[in-house]
Amino acid sequence: MKNLQISLGLSLLLVISACTNNENKHKAAIDLAAAWVEASYTSQDAALSMVNENMADEGVSLSDRYVGFGFVWNPEGDGMVIDYVVPESPAAGVLMEGDSFIEVNGIKLTNENRNNLGFRGKPGENVNAVIIRDGVEKPISIARGPVQIRYSKEQVVNNISNGDAESWGPEDFNIIEAGVTNDGVVYVLHWSEFVEDATGYKANAYTVTRFMFDEEGKVAWVGNLSEDRFVLEQQGWKITR
């Protein structure tokens, strides 16, 4: 029994030692990942500097997945004009930048109803629409499907630059812990609390951010998993079928 206890104790020490050595080996990556998250919360300037200085030129930032078409439009403008079509999305090969929706499932699109049309819903279902392309009306049909946007470094910089510096960041945040795998992939667990501008409702959520690095120590891949449903419920939303 005593020999077994000694053996287990030595095994535990070896595991702890291996974990410590691994963290020491990747300390620079862990520190950079934690600093990246902190900068993203702190200010627009801090976030912009962090990306410019530490994201690889060929690096990518992944958005949350959703079911839809796979296009981006500017809600600050009138109507619904396509700014960007996500590669390999249902919209790829059907929509083009500059296309403007005028009708969706038989309903004329207006500024008032454009957020309540049939773009979201069950995957696989077709949505019929009419767009204007180069001044000519064109009927289209697209089946909803999974979409995930991969932002390039240039797009990440543009997205940050187009943000509002005055309202940047949460009310409060905390970097809880960071860890690393044997392959050098870093995970950062963090928490934030924020207020929805339109309603004044306060919400909070935990988020895990995953980082991969290139040989030069630059961020090559970054993506988040968060408590999206929990946030929506705190803001008074509910899921309906």
Regions found by a protein language model. Name each.
Residues 84-90, 113:
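Short alpha-helix capping/helix-loop boundary micro-motifs
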Residues 116-154, 158:
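PDZ-domain C-terminal substructure recognizer with occasional recognition of PDZ-binding tails
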Residues 16-18:
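C-terminal motif of bacterial Sec signal peptides marking the signal peptidase cleavage site
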Residues 22-27, 34-84, 117-120, 142-143, ...:
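PDZ/PDZ-like peptide-tail recognition elements
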Residues 109, 145-146, 225-230:
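A short acidic/small-residue loop/turn micro-motif
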Residues 1-8:
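Bacterial N-terminal signal peptides that target proteins for export
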Residues 91-111:
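Conserved PDZ fold ligand-binding element
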Residues 21-27, 157-241:
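A beta-strand edge to alpha-helix "cap/lid" segment located at domain peripheries
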